[in-house]
Amino acid sequence: MKVTYEIENGKKIKVKTYVDGTVFKYDENGNKIYYKDNDGNEDWKEYDSNGKVIHYKNSNGREDWYEYDSNGNKIHSWDNRGYEYWQEHDANGNVIHLKDNDGYEKWYEFDANGHCIHFKDTDGIEWWSEHDANGNKIHFKDINGYERWC
């Protein structure tokens, strides 16, 4: 591996080049901003001031954008293929609601230890689970009547 530095847009960039042709580039904060594999596939990332990815694109034409709340939780994302989704989080950062632009929704409920104890979606899937004091799942039940004690 060879490490070099270059200046891009007035900023110092760390470049790692491997013998097989793979290249990684990192910004001044250590965030990976560029990757190229030995087959020529590439991807690029842009970050906000908190180190969260706000824009991603690759050499295959994919492009994604992300927005975050003040706690750093991803709350909105969309891409150049027309897909878009929104997320809500609880005080612990767990995703409790997800909705996409096709109308599909998911809801999650967590216990005080961060274990998912209830799931429901717009396709009619719903289940519940219980955990012991060590976090091990001890009971599972779904809306169709399936039940398992672990």
Give a label for each model feature.
Residues 14-150:
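A detector of tandem-repeat and repeat-rich interaction/domain scaffolds
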